[in-house]
Amino acid sequence: MPMFPEKILQSTPHKPGVYLMLDAKARVIYVGKAKDLVKRLTSYTRHSSSEHNKTTVMLKKVEQVKTIITTTEKEALILEASLIKKHKPRYNIILRDDKNYPYIAVTVGEEWPRVMMVRRKRRDNSRYFGPYSSATAMWATLKLIASLFPLRNCRGEKLRPRTRPCLNRQIGKCLAPCTGNVSRKIYMENVDKILLLLQGKSRDLLAELKRQMLQASERLNFEQAGQFRDQIRALKTTLEKQLVAAGHGKNQDVFGYVRSGTTVAVNILFVRDGLVSGSRSFFIEDYFGLDSQVLSQTISQYYDRETPPPKEILLPFSPENFELLSEYLADFTTHILQIKIPQRGDSTILVEMANTNARQLFAEKEKKERSWQSLGKSIKEKLQLSRTPETIECLDISNISGQHAIGSLVCFSGGEANKSRFRHYKIRTIEGPDDYGMMREVMERRFKRGIKEGNLPNLFVVDGGKGQLGMAMAVARELGITNELDWIGIAKERHEEGEKLYKPGRKNPILLPAHSPVLLYLMRIRDESHRYGITFHRKLRNRATLSSELDEIEGIGDNRKKLLLKKIGSLKKIKEASLQKLQEVEGIGPLLAKKIYTSLQRDKNKS
């Protein structure tokens, strides 16, 4: 019996394009591309409900199909990648590695650039390198940069002149442009060398340092020549510690691909100047499509203008639409791109290394699952729960005398933080300092939606003792969910007594040893809810402070406040922003930028 309605094809042309499948709630659940939309969609009408696979499950949920016609198949591929990133459809391949990897940013848009670690890219003039899967490797790189090319690390885009250099200058960790100790020409030469290093062009950097050393020697400037010599030695020592991948000096990305059941692990080795400089891994669970399709979609999602491909990509097998994919990736780079499926030689060793790393992902996943099974069993037994708590949620209320009140809900699944289910709730109905009332409001909103969507947790952790737990149980009784999940209160008592765990219907608290894995896990969840709440609460306070200060400036309304925050960030960053940076914000012209800059600088000097 066909499930895909043929009426969808009536208005569909025989042209290339993209199709979006929507469910009953008008949510995009799948995005696909086609050289011929009619032929591609017709293939779904032939699919029978008697087949038991992911396609069957998906097609049963399809209520509507939208199509977007493109001129070429390449345009369809570009649009498909863009729409997948935008909608994150349930049945497409979404690259997730559950980690917020750091980047190294070089603020080349500033007059005197800085080098720093950041957690996310901003749409500014900075150059970003990464992400670094190993924080240790990233900090080692920053340490090397600071020792070889010591740029300023003071805060603020604008350099503030000083009469005396800072401590970093005195210990040789800063060139001290603030005191006029270095010319901008020499400073920017150091920036260029840092960019070469971060781009993986270590051979080019060594050649440049040797050239400058010889020039300094010819000028009889032996002190400067000695400095270049020391930089060369330090750089060579660092490079010798890296794994030599091959006898060449190529830049390559090497893909490893391993499937186990309905899960795929992908590992990407980064080879720069013939050295393995790092890697990144992804899990793709319950995927839709053949291995060649999965690999093709993984590659098209991974690369973009912010993450351009290197000169060479090595793959374990041929992806779907090989030529089209090559053409698509070529748009993201200025050099000639080669995509190879090696059959012999050193390149096959690299691909096997990437495959081995992908297999290791499964081993680590199995180890985590075994660890959680043991911990989950202990939690159930120690707390006398009705079920193993695969999902645990915890709520924290943050406010200062009732101001900027929010509820922060965190969720842990299978022993790990499930950040896709973290939520902030702005308090709507309670005024003044009423923690119980705020708690009731947030819980009602969370559980009413949870009942409707069928996603209640197995265990709910209340941050507090008997009083807070009693309030939670009152809400549970009103909603009829007292037995749908387990409930625990965790209260920090006097220091010598430690943490106490409270259960509904039990008079005395459960006392666990301070080193108990069960207690430590519950404390970790509770502390994460505090951190999540405090971070957002601080952001709200900053916005309120910004609003009050900007309200005094003529020409600034709510829309421009939002634009300033979106473009620049916090109040602190807006206060530190240069005139040029303020003018880059949409709707802020030169006159208004000067007015904002003058006003905020005056307020800052007063404080």
From Swiss-Prot:
<dbReference type="Pfam" id="PF14520">
    <property type="entry name" value="HHH_5"/>
</dbReference>
<dbReference type="InterPro" id="IPR004791">
    <property type="entry name" value="UvrC"/>
</dbReference>
<dbReference type="GO" id="GO:0009381">
    <property type="term" value="F:excinuclease ABC activity"/>
</dbReference>
<dbReference type="GO" id="GO:0003677">
    <property type="term" value="F:DNA binding"/>
</dbReference>
<dbReference type="Pfam" id="PF22920">
    <property type="entry name" value="UvrC_RNaseH"/>
</dbReference>
<comment type="function">
    <text>The UvrABC repair system catalyzes the recognition and processing of DNA lesions. UvrC both incises the 5' and 3' sides of the lesion. The N-terminal half is responsible for the 3' incision and the C-terminal half is responsible for the 5' incision.</text>
</comment>
<keyword id="KW-0234">DNA repair</keyword>
<dbReference type="GO" id="GO:0005737">
    <property type="term" value="C:cytoplasm"/>
</dbReference>
<dbReference type="Pfam" id="PF08459">
    <property type="entry name" value="UvrC_RNaseH_dom"/>
</dbReference>
<keyword id="KW-0963">Cytoplasm</keyword>
<dbReference type="InterPro" id="IPR010994">
    <property type="entry name" value="RuvA_2-like"/>
</dbReference>
<keyword id="KW-0267">Excision nuclease</keyword>
<dbReference type="GO" id="GO:0009380">
    <property type="term" value="C:excinuclease repair complex"/>
</dbReference>
<dbReference type="Pfam" id="PF02151">
    <property type="entry name" value="UVR"/>
</dbReference>
<dbReference type="InterPro" id="IPR035901">
    <property type="entry name" value="GIY-YIG_endonuc_sf"/>
</dbReference>
<comment type="subunit">
    <text>Interacts with UvrB in an incision complex.</text>
</comment>
<feature type="domain" description="UVR">
    <location>
        <begin position="203"/>
        <end position="238"/>
    </location>
</feature>
<dbReference type="InterPro" id="IPR047296">
    <property type="entry name" value="GIY-YIG_UvrC_Cho"/>
</dbReference>
<dbReference type="GO" id="GO:0006289">
    <property type="term" value="P:nucleotide-excision repair"/>
</dbReference>
<dbReference type="InterPro" id="IPR001162">
    <property type="entry name" value="UvrC_RNase_H_dom"/>
</dbReference>
<comment type="similarity">
    <text>Belongs to the UvrC family.</text>
</comment>
<dbReference type="InterPro" id="IPR038476">
    <property type="entry name" value="UvrC_RNase_H_dom_sf"/>
</dbReference>
<keyword id="KW-0227">DNA damage</keyword>
<keyword id="KW-0742">SOS response</keyword>
<dbReference type="InterPro" id="IPR001943">
    <property type="entry name" value="UVR_dom"/>
</dbReference>
<keyword id="KW-0228">DNA excision</keyword>
<dbReference type="InterPro" id="IPR050066">
    <property type="entry name" value="UvrABC_protein_C"/>
</dbReference>
<protein>
    <recommendedName>
        <fullName>UvrABC system protein C</fullName>
    </recommendedName>
</protein>
<feature type="domain" description="GIY-YIG">
    <location>
        <begin position="14"/>
        <end position="93"/>
    </location>
</feature>
<dbReference type="InterPro" id="IPR000305">
    <property type="entry name" value="GIY-YIG_endonuc"/>
</dbReference>
<dbReference type="Pfam" id="PF01541">
    <property type="entry name" value="GIY-YIG"/>
</dbReference>
<dbReference type="GO" id="GO:0009432">
    <property type="term" value="P:SOS response"/>
</dbReference>
<dbReference type="InterPro" id="IPR036876">
    <property type="entry name" value="UVR_dom_sf"/>
</dbReference>
